[in-house]
Amino acid sequence: LHQRGCNCAQAVACTFCKEFGISEDDMFRIAEGFGLGMGVMEMCGALSGMAMIIGLDNSQGGTEEGSRTKGDTYKKIRSKVEKFKEKNGSCICRELKGVETGKVLCSCPQCIADAVALTEEYLAEQGK
């Protein structure tokens, strides 16, 4: 998907559209603003895409139910982000890309692959 013009968040989130019954076009639009570390090279877009899918899967609420699953969702996302950081040395886009140091820690395609793998790991842990 990244080679087709998707940003990192879109490439991860759109990978799981069929599992959740969401059209790729809708997910593409939802995830668009999360690329390039939300446009300022902060939190890796691939991890933002992963967080979207974990939230989509784990949330049991709606606007009427409030926040009954938020804490659990945050915990699950935090666990996967920590695993990503352990492997790649950061979760910050500009650090991963070596913008200030000249040393690339992880390429965009590898960040996407790692985030997809962590999302698949999460889904397997949930029995999916």
Where are the model-predicted features located?
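Short cysteine clusters
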Residues: 8, 44, 93
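Acidic-glycine-rich active-site phosphate/pyrophosphate-binding loop
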Residues: 13-32, 87-93
